Amino acid sequence: LWFPDSFLPILEETGEVEALDYYVYEAAFLWLSERMKKQQKIIPLSLNVSPIHFRKINTFIHKVSDLIDKYKIPSQYLIFEITETTYIHNIDAVNQMIRFFQKKNIRISMDDFGSGYSSLNTLKDILFDEVKIDKRFLDDDLSEKGKIVLQEIFHLLKRTNKLIVCEGVETKEMVDFLVQENCDELQGYYYYKPLEMQ
C-alpha cells in the first residue's frame, strides 16, 4: 500500500489531485454497489475532500451527486471528510457543500480537529455532523492534562449534538479512556492497519 503522504503532495503540485479524487470516488461507489448486489456486509465509507474542490464547489457537488445516483448508493454508507484547515480557509464553500449533502442525509465530518487554528468557540457554529479528533491529542500517551483537554472537548461536542470520532488509537489504555468518555467511534492501529479494498 502507498500512504497518501508519499504521493499527494506531488499530485497537488501538478494539479492532478482533482482527477484522482473523482477516480477514487467512482471506484469506491462501484465497490459499494457490487457489495450491495452480492448482499455482502457493508460499513460506511469515509471519503476525503481535497481543498482544490472548494474553488469549483458547484462542479464538485454535481459531479459527486451524479456518481452517487449512478451507482445508487444509499446515504447511510457515505461520509465526506473535510479537514479543519480546509474548513477555515473555505468556510462559505464548505458550508454550501454540507447543506447540499445533508439534504441527502449524507454525513459530513470535520477531520483533524485540533490540528489547525480554530478555537473551541468555533464548534458551536459548525454545520458538521461529526468531528474527528486529531491523533496528536493521543500521542502523549494520555497525560492527565491531555485527558482533561479531551474531556472538555467531548463535553462541548456532546452538548452541540456532534458525533465524536478519535483517530490514532493504538493502545488498550486509549480505548478504555475513550469508551469511558463516550467517544462514538474509534480508529487506529489498535484495531487494524490500512487494508486494501479487497
What are these regions (language model features)?
Residues S33-R35, S50-R55, Y77-I91, I106-Q198:
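EAL-family c-di-GMP phosphodiesterase catalytic domain
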Residues L1, Y25-F29, D112, G188:
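Short acidic-capped amphipathic helix/loop micro-motif used as an active-site/signal-coupling element
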Residues K63-K70, Q96-K104, I148, E152:
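Catalytic-core regions built around general acid/base machinery
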Residues F7:
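Conserved, function-defining core regions and hallmark residues within catalytic/recognition domains
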Residues I10-L11, V24-L32, K63-V64, M97, ...:
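Structural preference for long, well-ordered alpha-helical segments in enzyme cores
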Residues E16-A93, G168:
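Catalytic core of bacterial c-di-GMP phosphodiesterases, primarily the EAL and HD-GYP domains
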Residues L1-W2, E34:
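Short helix-loop capping/hinge motifs at secondary-structure junctions, enriched
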